[in-house]
């Protein structure tokens, strides 16, 4: 069949509307990453979906770090039945465009969702962000499984910390993140505050084993986290 019968143009991009899980999403036909996977299969990362469904409760404050085009943001909002707050943090402006369209498409109550065009790390400032030809593989790290998909282009993006964002929007009860290896820096930055009792969120993240090495090692960070009761 001809996809041209089913797609529309949004922001000069070919966008395809597809049922995903129990909601709908606009997906970028030129993206061979998350959009392509959802067009083909209508779902992804079932293990994380199951974790979120079991852990998330109404009235929670969620930090969705690496919110991308909204696959999890919509899911989180529906699980909480619009009775909670989601801080959706995403450094790519292209992804944010689709994220906003997808929230509108699903009639999500956007007053309960804050979208921040930024990355998250262990410092506040700016950092070089390497762009990939798949919308879910942009990264701070040039090595690892994302390397073959990097375009050679980069942009400088704003960087915030979880603690910095918490002071503006409240402490997170639940953190979901998919940050292409940068979970090392983010979790490490939380350890001190968790130890002090400032916060103790549920943390759900996708590990990126190929992005770890002796100088960028998740193991000691997780060991420290486990000592704090995780």
Regions found by a protein language model. Give the residues of each.
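Phosphate/nucleotide-binding beta-alpha loop and adjacent structural elements of enzyme active sites
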Residues: 1-230
């Amino acid at each position: 069949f001809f996809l041209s019968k089913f797609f529309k143009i949004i922001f000069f991009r070919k966008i395809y509307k597809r049922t995903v899980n129990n909601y709908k999403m606009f997906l970028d036909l030129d993206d061979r990453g998350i959009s392509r996977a959802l067009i083909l299969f209508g779902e992804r990362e079932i293990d994380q979906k199951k974790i979120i469904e079991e852990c998330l409760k109404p009235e929670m404050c969620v930090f969705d770090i690496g919110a991308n085009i909204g696959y999890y943001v919509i899911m989180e909002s529906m699980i909480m039945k619009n009775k909670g707050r989601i801080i959706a943090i995403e450094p790519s402006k292209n992804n944010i465009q689709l994220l906003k369209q997808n929230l509108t498409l699903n009639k999500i109550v956007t007053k309960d969702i804050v979208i921040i065009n930024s990355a998250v790390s262990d410092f506040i400032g700016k950092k070089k962000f390497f762009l990939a030809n798949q919308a879910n593989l942009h990264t701070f790290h040039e090595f690892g499984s994302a390397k073959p998909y990097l375009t050679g282009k980069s942009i400088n993006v704003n960087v915030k910390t979880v603690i910095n964002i918490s002071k503006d929007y409240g402490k997170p009860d639940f953190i979901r993140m998919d940050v292409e290896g940068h979970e090392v820096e983010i979790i490490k930055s939380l350890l001190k505050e968790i130890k002090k009792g400032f916060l103790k969120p549920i943390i759900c993240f996708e590990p990126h084993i190929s992005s770890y090495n002796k100088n960028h090692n998740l193991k000691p960070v997780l060991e420290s986290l486990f000592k704090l009761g995780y």
